[in-house]
A protein has these predicted regions:
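Conserved, well-structured beta-alpha core segment at the onset of a catalytic domain
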Residues: 2-3, 19, 301
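A residue-level marker of the well-folded mature domains of exported/periplasmic proteins
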Residues: 23-376
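Bacterial N-terminal signal peptides
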Residues: 10-19
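Bacterial N-terminal signal peptides that target proteins for export
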Residues: 1-9
Length: 376
């Protein structure tokens, strides 16, 4: 009896070690597509597919956010909590933790390391720096932890990235200005995002490449709006005070504040390429006939829900793309419609298009705003 029991314990321990070792080796590269191919759409035809060994739930999942000082990030945190609270998702979660560390890259990496060391099963991250996480990815793989980056993703093919085509978004804004600013020339104001992030870099590159390829005579004045209405309104007001007149504007975020700065300064309305803030779209509709010709494009904060959904699918042993491509939400003048592309009765500080129907993710403003923005 003792011999049999010893054998069973030894066999069980060996099996457990083999399972942990297999998981800790990181994902296996396999053939696609994913089971949920509509949601988990690969970025390109060359995107590889990952598969981890199936892990029994319920799971401990953490959101390691960096910068928190704007509406998009606050709404993202609220959306993450709303998604985790859905009955079908909540049933799969033992714990859902949220922490925001600010602009400090080292602090964000330390938070991720803390989650790894604390035994979390997966971590989703909106990265403050696209290149600083390579050692963290290795530590996550060694510990059997799945790392999913979204929005500000990572310059790597060794972790899962979930995002829209951020460079393509910059190209869209650039093409709007080339198309709508007369004469293929002029002075443009580019309101950038948070310095050092992949989103700011990629959107900027997209805009500038389009302007260069247009063959036009463009002068660009850059200011840093940090994707925040208050900050953008101040730096745009300062730019107008110095330069007096711009022929077109692109703004990565803080679009409502940017237009309000133009109104306050009595700057003539010009073509603007901006994000998907409800307040921005209200203004685009209100002042369209006075010359405010807008394209409003971006990605809703609900991409955090897609990142969590991806992490759970990977933990359940499903095949997922290394890089998942999400669609953009785009509305252009003259197609701004109340109750459809913007909501006049809702706050300005709300990002419209905050849904991904192909992933079964569609939140109302009330569902999101009912959640807190605090760490949990």
């Amino acid at each position: 009896m003792k011999t049999t029991l010893k054998y069973l314990l030894t066999a069980t321990a060996a099996s457990l070690v083999m399972t942990v070792s297999a998981y800790a080796a990181g994902p296996e590269i396999v053939k696609g597509p994913s089971k949920d191919a509509q949601c988990f759409k690969p970025l390109t035809a060359e995107t590889k597919f990952f598969q981890w060994p199936k892990k029994e739930g319920p799971y401990r999942i953490a959101l390691a956010n960096g910068f928190i000082g704007n509406t998009w990030r606050i709404q993202m945190i609220q959306t993450a909590k709303a998604y985790a609270a859905l009955p079908e998702v909540k049933a799969k979660l033992k714990e859902f933790k949220v922490v925001s560390t600010g602009d400090d890259v080292a602090a964000q990496i330390a938070a991720v390391d803390n989650f790894i060391n604390s035994g979390y099963d997966a971590i989703v991250v909106n990265a403050q720096n696209p290149t600083a996480f390579k050692p963290v990815i290795k530590r996550a793989n060694a510990a059997g932890v799945i790392l999913v980056a979204f929005d500000n993703t990572l310059d790597t093919d060794e972790a899962i990235n979930v995002n829209v085509d951020q460079k393509g978004l910059g190209e869209l804004w650039g093409n709007w200005l080339v198309k709508n600013v007369p004469g293929n020339k002029g002075k443009l104001l580019e309101v950038r995002g948070v310095t050092g992030t992949s989103v700011d870099r990629d959107r900027h590159e997209g805009i500038q490449e389009v302007l260069k390829k247009s063959g036009g005579n463009w002068e660009t004045v850059e200011v840093v709006g940090r994707w925040d209405d208050g900050t953008a309104q101040k730096v745009v007001a300062d730019a107008i005070a110095v330069h007096k007149r711009f022929d077109g504007v692109s703004v990565q975020g803080g679009s409502t504040g940017t237009v309000r700065a133009m109104i306050d300064a009595k700057h003539p309305f010009v073509p603007v390429g901006g994000e998907t803030e409800n307040g921005f779209r209200k203004l685009c509709s209100q002042y369209s006939k006075e010359g405010l010709k807008c394209t409003s494009a971006g990605t809703g904060p609900a991409q955090v829900a897609v990142a969590i959904k991806t992490a759970i699918a990977a933990l359940e042993g499903e095949v997922v793309p290394q890089s998942i491509s999400l669609p953009l939400s785009v509305v252009e003048d003259p197609d701004f419609k109340d109750g459809d592309s913007f909501y006049s009765k809702e706050t300005d500080n709300f990002f419209v298009g905050n849904s991904f129907p192909t992933c079964g993710i569609n939140f109302t403003a009330q569902e999101i705003m009912g959640q807190s923005k605090a760490d949990q």
